């Protein structure tokens, strides 16, 4: 069972972000890329297309959303918790360690402590970040000099907001942020997501 979007199982406490009260005020929009065919595999990857994060990550995302709102922006989330089975599906399609974590080691996404996101302006238009989400190219790297000055500034804005809120970043993906201690959280599978809340 669930209460207020909260689920507890052996993996710890998870939140459905669209039901997490602190983020349900419009500061965050969710469009999970792997819940639809609109991703690099060309097909849906998720069995459960709800957007989950662990409590620690959800709290830091709340802080980041507050900081973004001060600048007149809000977030669009492309991905959050990615069950281990989904990580295997992505890896089997494109086994590129620069852009995908080897599922044998485990991804921060598969632990519920990573988020892929961008910034939207007050009209809901995504800021220019120089590449699309999941563009597996060096232009996706932080600090890439081949993108426009405006896109570089937008990436720095996102980096500043997320860093101030306590997130770590991945140097090869401008959209990816994670907690600093991801391996301290257990991996989450589709089977574990289906387990009822523990008392």
PLM regions: where:
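Segments that shape or occlude catalytic/ligand-binding pockets
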Residues: 83
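Short, well-ordered surface patches within globular domains
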Residues: 86
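Conserved metal-phosphate-binding beta-hairpin within the catalytic cores
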Residues: 177
């Amino acid at each position: 069972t669930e209460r207020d979007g909260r689920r507890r199982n052996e993996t710890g406490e998870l939140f459905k972000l669209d039901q997490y009260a602190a983020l349900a005020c419009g500061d965050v929009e969710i469009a999970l890329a792997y819940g639809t065919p609109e991703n690099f595999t060309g097909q849906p990857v998720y069995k459960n297309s709800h957007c989950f994060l662990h409590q620690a990550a959800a709290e830091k995302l709340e802080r980041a959303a507050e900081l973004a709102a001060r600048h007149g922006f809000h977030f669009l989330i492309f991905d959050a918790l990615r069950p281990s089975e989904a990580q295997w599906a992505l890896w089997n399609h494109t086994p590129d360690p620069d852009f995908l974590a080897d599922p044998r080691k485990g991804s921060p996404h598969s632990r519920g402590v990573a988020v892929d996101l961008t910034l939207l302006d007050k009209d809901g238009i995504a800021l220019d970040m120089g590449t699309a989400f999941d563009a597996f190219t060096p232009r996706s790297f932080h600090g890439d000099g081949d993108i426009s000055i405006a896109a570089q500034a937008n990436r720095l804005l996102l980096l500043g907001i997320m860093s101030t809120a306590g997130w770590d970043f991945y140097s090869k993906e401008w959209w990816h942020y994670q907690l600093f201690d991801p391996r301290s959280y257990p991996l989450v599978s589709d089977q574990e997501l289906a387990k009822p809340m523990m008392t």
